[in-house]
C-alpha cells in the first residue's frame, strides 16, 4: 500500500494525474464523465457501486483544435416544441438561442407566432456527461472501452486526415475508431500479446 494511504480510502489517481499534467504546463479544459448503464458489477456493501469514469480534456495551449459541431447533440423534443410555439418580440430570448447568444433571424416569429423550421436549431453543444454503455469484447483484454467513446473524442479533437496517438494502445480500440473515421493512428503498447490482438482486430495499418 502506498505510504500515506488508508485502507478503503480513495487515492484519486485520475485527479492526481490531471493536476500533475496541469503543473507540467497543460491546460485542464474539461472533466467529462463517462456514464455506464451496464458497469462492471461490484461486491461492495458499504459504498455506492461505481458506474462512471473520468475523461479529461487537456490541451498544450489556450488555442487548440476542437470541433464542437462534429459531436453536437440533438435538442430534446420538448425544446423543439417550445421553439415552434413562438415567442413575442418582447420576450428576452426573442432573437436569441439561450446559451448561444443572438443569431440573426433565428427566433423571429412569423405570422401566427411560429418559427421557421428551416431556421430552428436542431442541435446543442455536447454536455460533459456521456452515456455510453460498454460493449462485449471476446479478446484477451479485459478493460477494452467501447469504440463509440474513442470515436467521440477523435471527432472532437482530431481533424480529418490527422493523426491520433494512443500511448496505451491495449487491444487497439483507438486505432479501430481512428481507421473508421479516416484518421491515421499511432499506438504504443508494451504487451506483445495486446499488440497481436490489436493487429488482428483492426485488420491492417501500422499497429
What are these regions, as identified by a protein language model?
Residues 1-207:
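Core catalytic lobe of class I
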